[in-house]
């Protein structure tokens, strides 16, 4: 996954995203799917500046949360945010190279991060998530998805991506989240050209996860489906 853009935006990331109440609601919805006990471990894939981590550390007071991200600047901000917290750990990694031993985690979570995985590496990413989860460990993954598969110049896919991104951007304009609106509009050419942004269908990720050993897969629908957000929940099959 490319890191240059996220290294550049790291300092302003929270300022851009914090006014987006929809983004904050998705974080809460992910958290509602995580039910931990004492000593359990959660992995946050693509932790960024630590917004989902912060929510989980608050709502899962007996759990340990490990965040990984490919961007060094994001990691520095996240590590500073949780400095001195013995239940938080931050390191460099991505969906294809998590950097932990096998069967270490009870939960793996991710929010708007895995669409940065190169299309040809999606199967490897699904396998890596399965590797680090314990048997019966749970994945909770939220992202933006297209309804139409296809290449960079596929008209149906292009239209679907543009409609979703513009709808979400206009929603942020209505919220007064002006910088988030601009950020979303600036990403449209990258999504269209498949340049560091590789939004795909829910069904494609479900197929990769099933092949990697996940079962009890379900798609959790969230408000404003026109934005493309869905939450995928799955359980790693027992040994």
Q: What feature does the model see in each segment?
A:
Residues 1-36, 51-55, 189:
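Conserved class I S-adenosyl-L-methionine
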Residues 41, 136-138:
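Short glycine-centered segments of the SAM/dcSAM-binding site in methyltransferase folds
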Residues 43-45, 49-97:
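Class I SAM-dependent methyltransferase SAM/SAH-binding core
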Residues 96-107:
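A short acidic, Gly/Pro-enriched loop at the edge of an enzyme's catalytic core
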Residues 107-121:
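A short SAM/SAH-binding and catalytic strip from SAM-dependent methyltransferases
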Residues 123-135:
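A short glycine-rich, Lys/Arg-flanked "PGG" loop and its adjoining helix->strand segment in the class I
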Residues 142-210:
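C-terminal alpha-helical "lid/dimerization" subdomain adjacent to the S-adenosyl-L-methionine
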Residues 212-239:
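Core SAM-dependent methyltransferase catalytic element
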């Amino acid at each position: 996954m490319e890191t240059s853009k996220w290294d550049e935006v790291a300092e302003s990331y929270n300022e851009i995203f914090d006014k987006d109440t929809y983004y904050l609601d998705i974080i809460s919805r992910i958290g509602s799917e995580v039910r931990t006990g004492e000593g359990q471990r959660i992995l946050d894939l693509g932790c960024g500046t630590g917004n989902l981590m912060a929510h989980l550390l608050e709502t899962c007071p007996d759990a340990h949360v490990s965040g990984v991200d490919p961007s060094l600047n994001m990691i520095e901000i996240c590590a500073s945010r949780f400095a001195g917290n013995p239940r938080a750990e931050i390191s460099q990694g991505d969906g294809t190279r998590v950097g932990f031993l096998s069967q270490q985690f009870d939960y793996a979570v991710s929010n708007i991060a895995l669409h940065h995985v190169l299309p040809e590496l999606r199967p490897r990413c699904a396998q890596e998530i399965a590797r680090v989860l314990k048997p019966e460990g749970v994945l909770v993954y939220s992202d933006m998805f297209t309804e139409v598969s296809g290449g960079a110049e596929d008209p149906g896919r292009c239209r679907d991506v543009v409609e979703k991104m513009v709808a979400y951007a206009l929603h942020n304009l209505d919220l007064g989240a002006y910088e988030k609106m601009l950020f979303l509009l600036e990403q449209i050419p990258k999504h269209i050209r498949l340049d560091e942004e590789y939004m795909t269908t829910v069904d494609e990720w479900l197929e990769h996860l099933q092949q990697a050993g996940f079962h009890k897969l379900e798609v959790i629908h969230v408000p404003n489906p026109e934005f493309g957000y869905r939450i995928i929940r799955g359980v790693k099959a027992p040994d």
